Amino acid sequence: MLDREGYRPNVGIVLLNSRNEVFWGKRVGQHSWQFPQGGIQHGESPEQAMYRELHEEVGLLPEHVQIIGRTRDWLRYDVPEEYLRRQNSTRVHRAAYRGQKQIWFLLRLVGLDSDIQLRAFEHPEFDAWRWVPFWIQLDAVIGFKREVYQLALSELARYLSRGMRMQQLAWGTPLDLFQSFYAGNEDQSKSSEKSDK
């Protein structure tokens, strides 16, 4: 199901734990990591699709999560032609298909980590997972999705604690904040390693 511009409706899911860390899933047989996501089927609302995808990819049920917020509008990314040529998908007519348009949901896990089951379905999307900081560096995400991830995280950050939002305003964009924090921690650990010698 494509819209008039060639985008497939889709949902993206940012799942938080109690420490505001996010679920990060490793694609089966690949070295790329991503948030859960999936297509909206005919007749489904974005929320219904989100719950279905959450169950299919992560094994969670509606009672395991609380919806905190969602993006106001669709966020789009184009899939590069060379990537489409490598796929053997017959579901989407390549001549018309441009990419995905996504509504992103921010969820809080109210269940347990043990409720996460990557093999809930016969064909799992992920073969490993971990909790990572909200402002995760996106190098492990396939290149053409990175901008949409930055947009989604930036928009969904408004639902986080006031303290995190104030840091964002004081120190630039959320990604700038994370990268400066990450770089600062690397510098500190290098200097402490040197002083230990």
UniProtKB/Swiss-Prot annotation:
Protein name: RNA pyrophosphohydrolase
Nudix hydrolase domain segment(s): 6-154
Alphabetical list of HAMAP family matching this protein: Nudix_RppH
Function: Accelerates the degradation of transcripts by removing pyrophosphate from the 5'-end of triphosphorylated RNA, leading to a more labile monophosphorylated state that can stimulate subsequent ribonuclease cleavage.
Family in the record: Belongs to the Nudix hydrolase family. RppH subfamily.
EC numbers, comma separated: 3.6.1.-
Entry-linked Pfam families: NUDIX (PF00293)
Keyword Oxidoreductase: no
Classification via InterPro entries: Nudix_hydrolase, NUDIX_hydrolase-like_dom_sf, NUDIX_hydrolase_CS, NUDIX_hydrolase_dom, RppH
Molecular function (Gene Ontology), one example: pyrophosphatase activity
